[in-house]
């Protein structure tokens, strides 16, 4: 995914945007050969928009429409159009709480990434940290993956493990997974920006330095 210049990143988020902050900080430190081209949110007072504007990144609220779990067609066209106008190379989902549909997936096929709080394919979907506790696993973690039409089912780019402690609660485990996400996501985006990621079907390999 390496481009002639810096990778242009578009970010979608619905909440505080802590993973976006981790990536943006890595960009500003020169650890990722990229620039934040656009930040979009379906929540008008989302923290991710406030942070983006405070750091003078282009940021916009997109009214999501009438559905609770997905964008309506008009909103999806607005998101696609905004990202295309910003000449985005890679779409980064950072706590975006709506399902992406066919038009969006086709427009950015192979160029959308997400992070999930489990070691996929284990525990897809919501409350993955609670699923891990309920199943009694001893190790969980987080996964960066490409986005496809399924639920947390795209090809896996990278993973980081987190030990499950005997006295963990859903809240304490979630906090440690979240901290791991802030390490893993920038590392994976940096590898994509540097052209170090190769994809063949479901197999993703990293070119070593």
Predicted feature residues:
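One-carbon transfer enzymes
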Residues: 1-209
């Amino acid at each position: 995914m390496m481009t002639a210049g810096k990778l242009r990143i578009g970010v979608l988020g619905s909440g505080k945007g802590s993973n976006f902050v981790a990536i943006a900080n890595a960009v500003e430190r020169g650890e990722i050969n990229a620039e934040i081209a656009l930040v979009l949110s379906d929540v008008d007072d989302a923290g991710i928009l406030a942070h983006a504007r405070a750091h003078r990144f282009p940021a916009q609220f997109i009214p999501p429409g009438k559905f609770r779990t997905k964008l309506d067609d008009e909103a999806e066209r607005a998101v696609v159009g905004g990202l295309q106008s910003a000449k985005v190379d890679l779409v980064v989902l950072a706590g975006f709480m709506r399902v992406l549909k066919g038009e969006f997936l086709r427009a950015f096929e192979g160029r959308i990434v997400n992070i999930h709080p489990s070691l996929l394919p284990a525990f897809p979907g919501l409350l993955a940290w609670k699923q891990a506790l309920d199943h009694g696993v001893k190790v969980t973690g987080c996964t960066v993956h490409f986005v496809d039409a399924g639920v947390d089912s795209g090809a896996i780019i990278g993973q980081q493990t987190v030990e499950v402690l005997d006295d963990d609660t859903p809240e304490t485990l979630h906090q440690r997974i979240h901290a791991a996400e802030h390490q893993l996501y920038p590392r994976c985006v940096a590898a994509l920006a540097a052209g170090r990621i190769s994809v063949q079907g479901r197999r993703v390999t990293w070119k070593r330095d």
